[in-house]
């Protein structure tokens, strides 16, 4: 790998920064050119080359010198064109979706800033630089989720996202501080010292990934984030914010892979997340929230692979997942515009006739998510299921991951049955599928079909002989078929059956295991106690001791003493004079 590669990466970063200063109409073409440029260094990836480039110093101190340093390896050079490609497609779609927004220029600039901060994470070679990008995607998600700040729900969702991510950020800060004081924040040096890494910074890494990638226990913010514009949801869930947590663990996996406790935590956390989110998605009818919970489920699958010591498979699934997930969100945005901002899939139907191309793209995206053979999702998901089935690590994790696979096929089919099939159930505002809609969706559709095959052809040079039983080999396909059949029954029950009493299991998953209740209760009570402590102990004590109350208490005794005087000065003087004279006469008589 020669100096052309870092030159190209630096050119891309500088061009993106310059694009922020230009009118938003040129952004689409700029991103297309940058994407084509970013494809040039892909050829050296086949040789597993790696290059580290150190630039100008960022912080100089007596104890630590921190330089701006980028690392160019397989992960960074492969994910950079993917992020550019998806942002290019989403930006072009946004020109139609946000056309009536008076601040569309600022919106496009926010999307570009979001992309830049993600590229900082991808190419960072030290923990401090990674933390800058980490905080960047956090603050940009806050601004974009709360874009429609006139809506109370959008403001609440933006605050919820940033607060949940603060919890994960504490873990990353703890890890960075620990590494800075004990070894080094340079990633190459961390990889060398992986044998002696303490468990505390590893806990911080897992906590950071849990918060950023919305794993179980810190998951409620992700469905709420759907209050933002649909292009924001597409970018957030495909190639930026939520994959940053898993990418962090993939990047720093060499310091994790020898710690069995942390790997077990990742395995259990990922398996629980993928099953829980898939089950919750089957209870929702908001199309964007279903897709959001689908993202959580797929992130749990990636976390499971990290727990099985297979970060390469997690990265492969991250790549394939980003294309069809972006396409799912953009298709849902087209539907929502067509139906006067209606997001309930029960109110949709017959969209194959009014939006034929969007419906076709949605079908392909859902089939890829289900793991339909020879689509891009199949090559990663099927490999993950086979790896799980052949692993002796944890049979419980295998079981609930298989349940999640069935449920993912279930809710994906449910989306298609409710939206595309049957007859319209609400008023349509038919719009022409312009090139700003079809072109990005067509590009994402091609990558959702071909990306898996291209990855296989470029990485697997020889055909591997299958040595596993046919039941294990076909396990993923069988699970998908079961999920499709199950969704047919669920759709029929939704349309034609009314429950006699509330379903507690349905309510449990629909309310996301009621995690909002303890989270908000603990927060509110903590704030109340803090406020009471501040006002009742600090403020009141200060006022009573040092303020007007304290001054009043100090001079009260003196005032009382003065008020006891009766102003009988003549009597007092006469008594004083007589006493004095008596004493003097007594002294003189002696």
UniProtKB/Swiss-Prot annotation:
Its EC number is 7.1.1.2. It comes from the Eukaryota. Pfam families: NADH5_C, Proton_antipo_M, Proton_antipo_N. It comes from Lycodon semicarinatus (Ryukyu odd-tooth snake). It is found in: Mitochondrion inner membrane. This is NADH-ubiquinone oxidoreductase chain 5. It is a multi-pass membrane protein. Keywords: Electron transport, Membrane, Mitochondrion, Mitochondrion inner membrane, NAD, Respiratory chain, Translocase, Transmembrane, Transmembrane helix, Transport, Ubiquinone. GO terms for biological process: ATP synthesis coupled electron transport; electron transport coupled proton transport. The gene is MT-ND5. GO terms for cellular component: mitochondrial inner membrane. InterPro entries: NADH_DH_su5_C, ND/Mrp_TM, NU5C-like, Proton_antipo_N.
């Amino acid at each position: 790998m020669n100096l052309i590669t870092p030159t190209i990466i630096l050119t891309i970063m500088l061009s993106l920064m310059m694009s922020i200063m230009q009118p938003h109409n040129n952004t689409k073409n700029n991103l297309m050119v940058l994407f084509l440029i970013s494809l040039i260094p892909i050829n050296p990836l086949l040789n597993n080359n790696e290059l580290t480039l150190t630039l100008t110093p960022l912080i100089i101190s007596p104890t630590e010198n921190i330089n701006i340093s980028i690392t160019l390896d397989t992960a960074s050079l492969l994910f950079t064109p993917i992020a550019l490609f998806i942002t290019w497609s989403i930006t072009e779609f946004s020109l139609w979706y946000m056309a009536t927004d008076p601040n569309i220029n600022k919106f496009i600039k926010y999307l570009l800033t979001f992309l830049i901060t993600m590229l900082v994470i991808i190419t960072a070679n030290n923990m401090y630089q990674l933390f800058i990008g980490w905080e960047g995607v956090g603050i940009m998600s806050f601004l974009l989720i709360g874009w429609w700040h006139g809506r109370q729900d959008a403001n609440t969702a933006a605050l919820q996202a940033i607060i949940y991510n603060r919890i994960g950020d504490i873990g990353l800060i703890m890890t960075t501080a620990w590494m800075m004081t004990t070894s080094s924040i340079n990633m190459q040096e961390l990889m060398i010292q992986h044998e002696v890494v303490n468990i505390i910074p590893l806990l911080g890494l897992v906590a950071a990934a849990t918060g950023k990638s919305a794993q179980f226990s810190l998951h409620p913010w992700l469905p709420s984030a759907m209050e933002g514009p649909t292009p924001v949801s597409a970018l957030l869930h495909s190639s930026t914010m939520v994959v940053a947590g898993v990418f962090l663990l993939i990047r720093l996996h060499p310091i994790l892979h020898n710690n069995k406790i942390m790997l077990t935590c990742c395995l259990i956390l990922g398996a629980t997340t993928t099953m829980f989110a898939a089950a919750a998605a089957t209870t929702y009818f908001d199309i964007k929230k279903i897709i959001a919970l689908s993202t959580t489920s797929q992130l749990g699958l990636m976390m499971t692979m990290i727990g099985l010591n297979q970060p390469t498979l997690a990265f492969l699934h991250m790549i394939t997942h980003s294309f069809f997930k972006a396409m799912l969100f953009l298709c849902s945005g087209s539907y929502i515009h067509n139906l006067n901002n209606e997001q309930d899939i029960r109110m949709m139907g017959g969209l194959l006739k009014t939006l034929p191309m969007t419906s076709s793209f949605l079908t392909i995206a859902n089939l890829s998510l289900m793991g339909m053979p020879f689509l891009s999702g199949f090559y990663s998901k099927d490999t993950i299921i086979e790896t799980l089935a052949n692993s002796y690590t944890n049979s419980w994790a295998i079981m609930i991951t298989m349940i999640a696979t069935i449920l993912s096929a279930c809710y994906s089919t449910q989306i298609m049955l409710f939206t595309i099939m049957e007859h319209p159930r609400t008023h349509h505002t038919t719009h022409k599928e312009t090139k700003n809609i079809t072109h990005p969706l067509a590009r994402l559709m091609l990558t959702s079909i071909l990306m898996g095959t291209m990855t296989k052809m470029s990485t697997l040079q020889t055909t591997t002989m299958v040595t596993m039983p046919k039941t294990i080999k076909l396990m993923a396909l069988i699970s998908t078929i079961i999920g499709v059949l199950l969704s047919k029954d669920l759709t029929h029950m939704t349309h034609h059956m009314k429950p006699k009493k509330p379903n507690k299991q349905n309510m449990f998953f629909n309310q996301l295991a009621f995690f909002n209740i303890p989270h908000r209760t603990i927060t509110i009570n903590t704030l109340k106690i803090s406020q009471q402590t501040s006002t009742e102990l600090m403020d009141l004590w200060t006022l009573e001791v040092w303020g007007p109350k304290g001054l009043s208490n100090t001079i009260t005794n003196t005032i009382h003493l003065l008020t006891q005087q009766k102003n009988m000065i003549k009597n007092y003087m006469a008594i004083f004079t007589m006493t004095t004279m008596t004493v003097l006469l007594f002294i003189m008589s002696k």
